Amino acid sequence: MSSSRYEPSWDVDLAPLLSCKLCLGEFPLEQMTTISQCQCIFCSLCLKQYVELLIKEGLETAISCPDSACPKQGHLLENEIECMVAGEVMQHYKRLQFEREVLLDPCRTWCPSSSCQAVCQLNEAEVQLPQPVQCPECSLRFCSACRADCHTGQACQEMLPITTFLPGENGSNLKSQEDEAPIKRCPKCKVYIERDEGCAQMMCKNCKHAFCWYCLESLDDDFLLIHYDKGPCRNKLGHSRASVIWHRTQVVGIFAGFGLLLLVASPFLLLATPFVLCCKCKCKRGDDDPLPT
């Protein structure tokens, strides 16, 4: 009778785990994705969510590496993006790319009709000057500079609200319908912005310019939203009075907190300044002294 000893098997997969810089989790290599331009590596789920968020929010057309300290400042290639997002998300991304190309091309512009949105070609020889443009799709004639009805021989009225209009509309009824227009153009970069409902304080995703939806006045420096307390836009913000007061209380509290912090820290700064200056002078004097021979 022969007996054999049982020898346990220790064949364990000892493949190293890699750390994701976004979620700080550790994953095997097959669950990670490497960006080809910079060789930064992230878990596939985090990178997919990051890319989808930027595309859906329309924040970027060139999607950069999510690592803010990336030494090469790499960007994801189009084929890399296409491999990780759904088909409809990729179509939206390509649409954003096309809109960006038209925006940066001085020889192309968008038809201002909200029902058309075709791309119109400008005369390259006169691209720096206002010129009449006719849409190839809806035949609407408009000015390339102010986007209003074609006004050959007359100066552009730059102060008119920048709203979209339908074919056949003229300037008289455009002014009366400007508040109800669902689509307007950013007064700074001229891109289209659509508003369904809600707050009248708008921020352009393209240039980050804050403005009033009704009169297009800049709100970049109006932290307390005083604009909606007087004038034609009074009480048109779209929020209750209580929520506006709460917003202002928060803003004032933030500024007051910074002021109080500066007030408390100022005596310590005054006391520390002479010591810092003395240390700097001493270090400089030590550098200037010749080495002993």
Curated annotation (Swiss-Prot):
Pfam families: IBR (PF01485), IBR_1 (PF22191). A zinc finger (IBR-type) spans 91-156. GO terms for molecular function: ubiquitin conjugating enzyme binding; ubiquitin protein ligase activity; zinc ion binding. Zn(2+) 3 binds at residues 143, 146, 151, 156. The chain crosses the membrane at residues 251-271. InterPro entries: E3_UB_ligase_RBR, IBR_dom, TRIAD_supradom, Znf_RING, Znf_RING/FYVE/PHD, Znf_RING_CS. The active site is at residue 199. CDD domains: BRcat_RBR_RNF144A (cd20366), mRING-HC-C4C4_RBR_RNF144A (cd16777), Rcat_RBR_RNF144 (cd20352). Zn(2+) 4 binds at residues 186, 189, 204, 207. Its EC number is 2.3.2.31. SUPFAM superfamilies: RING/U-box. Pathway: Protein modification; protein ubiquitination. It is found in: Membrane. Zn(2+) 2 binds at residues 111, 116, 135, 138. Zn(2+) 1 binds at residues 20, 23, 43, 46. It is a single-pass membrane protein. It is an enzyme of class 2 (transferase). A zinc finger (RING-type) spans 20-70, 186-215. PROSITE patterns: TRIAD, ZF_RING_1, ZF_RING_2. Keywords: Membrane, Metal-binding, Repeat, Transferase, Transmembrane, Transmembrane helix, Ubl conjugation pathway, Zinc, Zinc-finger. One of its GO terms (cellular component) is ubiquitin ligase complex. GO terms for biological process: protein ubiquitination; ubiquitin-dependent protein catabolic process. Belongs to the RBR family. RNF144 subfamily. E3 ubiquitin-protein ligase which accepts ubiquitin from E2 ubiquitin-conjugating enzymes ube2l3 and ube2l6 in the form of a thioester and then directly transfers the ubiquitin to targeted substrates. This is Probable E3 ubiquitin-protein ligase RNF144A-B. It comes from Danio rerio. The gene is rnf144ab.
